[in-house]
Amino acid sequence: MHPHLDVNNQKQCADLIRALEECHKSFGKFFGECNTIKYELKACLTKDRNDKARLNRENARMRKKVIEENRKKEEIEERILTDRILQQERKKSHANEGAGDNNN
């Protein structure tokens, strides 16, 4: 079984699609005259689908890699900000301790 045959969607197989449609206009389709074209078209559509799937997998890997890199950058930035906040809090607590000693 193949998808709906559309020359615009399956451009690599357009010639075979047209040939099969032309063959099906005659009575030859009832006597197996179109079978060779049909098998060639099936092979072409399978190759086209596999090529699209391979490209989709490659694109997904690239998107996943970019997302992972961004996540790591965000984690590093978050750690840096957390460290800065902790340092500021320590400075404040040391300053408050020193001010408290002078008041006693």
Curated annotation (Swiss-Prot):
A motif (Cx9C motif 1) lies at residues 13-23. Keywords: Chaperone, Disulfide bond, Membrane, Mitochondrion, Mitochondrion inner membrane, Repeat. It is a peripheral membrane protein. The keyword Membrane applies. Pfam families: Cmc1. Disulfide bonds join C13-C44, C23-C34. It is found in: Mitochondrion inner membrane. InterPro entries: Cyt_c_biogenesis_Cmc1-like. One of its GO terms (cellular component) is extrinsic component of mitochondrial inner membrane. Residues 10-52 form the CHCH domain. A motif (Cx9C motif 2) lies at residues 34-44. The keyword Chaperone applies. Transmembrane segments: none annotated. GO terms for molecular function: copper ion binding. GO terms for biological process: mitochondrial cytochrome c oxidase assembly. Belongs to the CMC family. The twin Cx9C motifs are involved in the recognition by the mitochondrial mia40-erv1 disulfide relay system and the subsequent transfer of disulfide bonds by dithiol/disulfide exchange reactions to the newly imported protein. Required for mitochondrial cytochrome c oxidase (COX) assembly and respiration. This is COX assembly mitochondrial protein 1. The gene is cmc1.
